[in-house]
Amino acid sequence: MIQPKPCSVLSLDIGDKRIGIAGCDPLGISITHLPAIFRDSFEKDLKEFEKICFDRRVEGLICGNPLDMNGMETKQSIRCKKYGIKLAKCLKLPLAFINEHCSTLEAKEKFSLKNDKTGRLDSAAAAILLQQWLIEGPDLDDSN
């Protein structure tokens, strides 16, 4: 695995009700948990992401891909990939997917966020994905 070139990215933990968000600085040194987006229509979600991306000068997106224990796609992973690709195209940003298997469980344990309905758990999971991406990659792909 190749460590990606550091840049300001958003990491997304895409769920049916909320999208957890974490971001990093352009050097990839600090990771910030951001407020989760409570999902609505794609158009409303997009407006929120446009503002976040503008404010943070985002250069790419990392999306969690919830593969099963064997690394195979699931119904949820297919939905996440479709959403991530559509969002990246609309925002004109490169995109990378990272296996998010057990990221929510890890976030629950690491940040003591059991039974959270506020979105903090989702954003904590996004932060774990971002930390994993900063170490392992893959590089962002702008061919979306």
Curated annotation (Swiss-Prot):
Entry keyword set: Cytoplasm, Hydrolase, Nuclease, Ribosome biogenesis
Pfam family, one: RuvX
Main location, first listed in the record: cytoplasm
Cellular compartments per GO CC: cytosol
GO biological process: rRNA 5'-end processing
InterPro entries noted in UniProt: RNaseH-like_sf, YqgF, YqgF/RNaseH-like_dom, YqgF/RNaseH-like_dom_sf
E.C. numbers: 3.1.-.-
Record family assignment: Belongs to the YqgF nuclease family.
Described function: Could be a nuclease involved in processing of the 5'-end of pre-16S rRNA.
Name of this chain's protein: Putative pre-16S rRNA nuclease
Native source organism of the sequence: Prochlorococcus marinus (strain NATL1A)
Top-level taxonomy: Bacteria, Bacillati, Cyanobacteriota, Cyanophyceae, Synechococcales
